[in-house]
């Protein structure tokens, strides 16, 4: 499994059998380094409806004739915008060709702004993505919560992607504890340095992970790892 980071919380996951993008905030993200026009995937996965996660999902799904996986209300919004969708909800699992997707809790909010109107986009979520026997946990935007320990106990996670930006999500201290609870030996930090209010030192965070026996990957946009 190859995982490429495109800034903020966007990850492209590739195996021989499938390609998936999660939270494709690309065209509006100064740190993405890629255009949504260049994305070729079999599915789009969304953690919640905020613009820095919904991003270019509808465009990417339409140009690839592939579905968007999202919590029910957000999936319906994407469907009304013309995309194919898979309606998910917290705790549910779906197998789609070579991809297995399970939605978990996240403690955050989820909405979409259109003009002066805010649209409810269902509950925020984390995502367990399994392809070819490898499992990635994308925590989405979340605070630290104790059931992360349960997720780690019930699922063999090969790689966890965790927000560290603070202010809008958990910060580095809480993310370090989340990594321990998830029992993942590899972690990618997400959701930092896109805006001044979420500036963090990812190298320092990964150094702290290393002291816990966890390998951290402070990827720059366009950089990849393989697991």
Model regions: which residues?
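Active-site HxH/HxHxD metal-binding segment of metal-dependent hydrolases
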Residues: 32-110
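Active-site environment of divalent metal-dependent phosphoester hydrolases
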Residues: 29, 50-55, 75-78, 92-95, ...
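Pre-active-site segment of Zn-dependent metallo-hydrolases
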Residues: 12-50, 55-59, 109-119, 142-154
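Zn-dependent metallo-beta-lactamase
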Residues: 1-19, 26-29, 95, 102-104, ...
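Short hydrophobic/aromatic beta-strand or adjacent loop that forms the aromatic wall/cage
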Residues: 8-10, 91, 122-126
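Active-site-proximal loop/helix segments of hydrolase catalytic cores
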Residues: 113-180
């Amino acid at each position: 499994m190859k995982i490429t980071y495109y800034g903020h919380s966007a990850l492209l996951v590739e195996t021989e059998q499938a390609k998936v993008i999660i939270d494709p905030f690309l065209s509006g993200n100064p740190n993405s380094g890629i255009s949504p026009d260049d994305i070729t995937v079999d599915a789009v996965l969304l953690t919640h409806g905020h613009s820095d996660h919904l991003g270019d999902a509808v465009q990417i799904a339409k140009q690839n004739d592939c579905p968007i996986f999202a919590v029910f209300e957000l999936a319906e919004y994407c469907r009304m915008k013309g995309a194919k969708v898979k309606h998910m909800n917290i705790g549910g699992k779906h197998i789609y060709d070579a991809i297995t997707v399970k939605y978990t809790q996240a403690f955050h909010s989820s909405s979409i702004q259109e003009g002066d109107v805010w649209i409810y986009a269902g509950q925020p979520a984390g995502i367990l993505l399994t392809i070819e026997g490898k499992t990635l946990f994308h925590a989405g935007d979340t605070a630290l919560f104790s059931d992360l320990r349960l997720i780690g106990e019930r699922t063999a996670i090969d790689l966890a992607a965790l927000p560290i930006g603070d202010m809008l999500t958990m910060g580095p201290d809480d993310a370090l504890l989340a990594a321990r609870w998830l029992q993942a030996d590899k972690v990618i930090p997400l959701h930092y340095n896109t805006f001044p209010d979420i500036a963090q030192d990812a190298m320092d965070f990964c150094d702290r992970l290393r002291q816990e026996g966890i390998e951290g990957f402070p990827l720059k946009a366009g950089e990849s790892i393989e697991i």
